From Swiss-Prot:
GO biological process assignments: translation
Name of the encoding gene: rpl23
Function comment: Binds to 23S rRNA. One of the proteins that surrounds the polypeptide exit tunnel on the outside of the ribosome.
NCBIfam families: PRK14548.1, uL23_arch
Keyword Ribosomal protein: yes
Subunit structure: Part of the 50S ribosomal subunit. Contacts protein L29.
Native organism: Thermoplasma acidophilum (strain ATCC 25905 / DSM 1728 / JCM 9062 / NBRC 15155 / AMRC-C165)
Keywords: Ribonucleoprotein, Ribosomal protein, RNA-binding, rRNA-binding
Gene Ontology terms: cellular component: ribonucleoprotein complex; ribosome
Protein name: Large ribosomal subunit protein uL23
MF-aspect GO terms: rRNA binding; structural constituent of ribosome
Length: 84
């Protein structure tokens, strides 16, 4: 499988609240990506530890909600990648 797993970060009011209160990032990912691929990509690209991943397929594509370990800040990562 060639190319990046992560297509883009998702930026809405709800995702901003999730980043702030629940320490979660919301990302659009390739449709053929699985949880292990997403976890590896997030940990390597952003230098964080992932606690869990929820994945859902929507009309707009595959969405991954990634819960980060307590020692990392989802808000800080989101600011660094230009979501907020």
């Amino acid at each position: 499988m060639k190319g990046d797993i992560i297509i883009s970060p998702l930026s809405t009011e709800k995702t901003a609240l999730m980043a702030e209160k629940e320490n979660k990032l919301t990302l659009m990912v390739r449709r053929d990506a699985n949880r292990e691929m997403i976890k590896k990509e997030v940990e390597e690209r952003f230098g964080v530890k992932v606690e869990g991943i929820n994945v859902m397929i929507t009309k707009k594509g595959k969405k991954a909600i990634v819960k980060l370990a307590k020692e990392y800040s989802a808000e800080e990562i989101a600011e660094r990648i230009g979501v907020f």
